[in-house]
Amino acid sequence: MNRDQLQGKWKQFRGRAQEKWGKLTDDDLDVVDGKADQLAGKIQERYGKTREEAEKEVDEFCHTCNC
């Protein structure tokens, strides 16, 4: 799955995202709404990671979620 597909299938993968990044709240995930950039921003905010680290995690998440 790529970043574009994440948005289209967000309802399917939202639970997986919350399992992976437990510090993300339901409100955070509502704001993200499948947007990879928003997800990276929330990971950066909640976990104190650099933008690059957060984007790498999102990319890895997208690649491990087989559609």
Per-range role (PLM):
Residues 1-67:
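Intrinsically disordered, low-complexity, hydrophilic segments
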